Structure formats: C-alpha cells, structure tokens
Amino acid sequence: MVVHRKVIKLLITILMVGLSSAAYSKDYQAGKNFTVIHSTVKQPPPLVEFFSFYCGPCYAFAERINVDTAIRKRLPDDMKLEKYHVSQMGPLGPALTEAWAVAQYAGVDGKVEKLLFEGLQVKRDIKTAADIVMVFNQLGITSEKYAEMQSNFMVKALIARQDNLVEKMKVHGTPSFYVSGKYHINNASLAQDDYDTYAEDMANLVLFLLNKPL
C-alpha cells in the first residue's frame, strides 16, 4: 500500500512537471501570438520595445510584472533589449523622447526610467520640460550639462532613430515588442495566470521569434 501510494505520487509529480514544461515550450503561432510585418527599415534592432512614460501598461511591464527583466535574463550576452520612446503620446512626448536619448547617452537610463515613470504616473509632479531636467538633477547631472547633451550629435541621432522607427514600423500602441524587424508580438495572447507566468511566456516567445529563420 505504501509503495502504491509512492508510485501514484511519483506519477502525479511527473505529470505536473510535464504540464508545466508544455506550457513554456508551446508552438507559438503567427496570427495569434505574433504578426508578421513587412517593414522597410534597414538593419532593424534584433529586439525593440516601443514605450511611453505616459503608458500605464509600460510602467507595469518595467516595474511590476517585470517583463523587461524576464526578457533580459534570457537573452544571449551579445544581445540587448532596445527601448525606444514614442513621441506622439502625451503633451511632453517629444521632450520625454529627448530625455530618454540623453539618459541612454549618459548611461543613466536604468535610473531615469523609474524616476520618469513615477513622476508622471505616481507623484504626478512632472508637468513641464523643466521638471524633466530636474529628474536628471537628482542624479547629479546639472541643467547646464543636460543642455549640452541636448545638442550632442549622437543624442540627436538617437532621437531621430526612435521617431523614424515608430513611423516606419507603424507603431500604434504601447508597449509594443518587435523582433528582427519582422515580428510584432501580440501581448494579449500570452498566459494570464499571474505576473511571473506572463513575464516568462513573453520571454519564451521572444526567444522563439529570435530563433526563427529570417
């Protein structure tokens, strides 16, 4: 009887592990989990997320659901998740795209991202372009240094790159993930059980698409 119970318990464990593995090794489908697009972008980033600091789901993906973290943990060492800001959203959209370019150039994008999200969506104390600069002041970047970086050629090029890709890839919502310039992920198609499952499913889908032959 004891042996019989142990066998049953073992079989149940194997079954549960099998079901769990199946959930994360499913065959993702075009038209359901992602859309095949035909963009004219030359040398698109392998993986890019379009977002806005005004976007509630974007904030959740970055800070609560931890989608970005789950994806970064699974990427090869020589690949990164690019994040491009959408200027068309909100009254400070263009200024925020510029701020994001400055943050990336200065290497403080990881810190600036959280502060800008909180300032716009939690504290709601970012009302003007000057308020955006004050976020950088908190990180030790003076207003003069910020103004200097605004005029930097590389910063201007990054702003143009973001705006250009938004237009050419026909980005109509955020957060939007594009893989290899060819696949647009359908966020709503992923597992909705809980935050961890959703983030893991997104990371799996990203890897699935990265490994698809072009």
Regions found by a protein language model. Give the residues of each.
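N-terminal secretory signal peptides that target proteins for export/translocation
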Residues: 1-6
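Structural cue for short, hydrophobic secondary-structure segments
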Residues: 49-51
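C-terminal cap of thioredoxin/glutaredoxin-like
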Residues: 139-214
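Bacterial N-terminal signal peptides
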Residues: 9-19
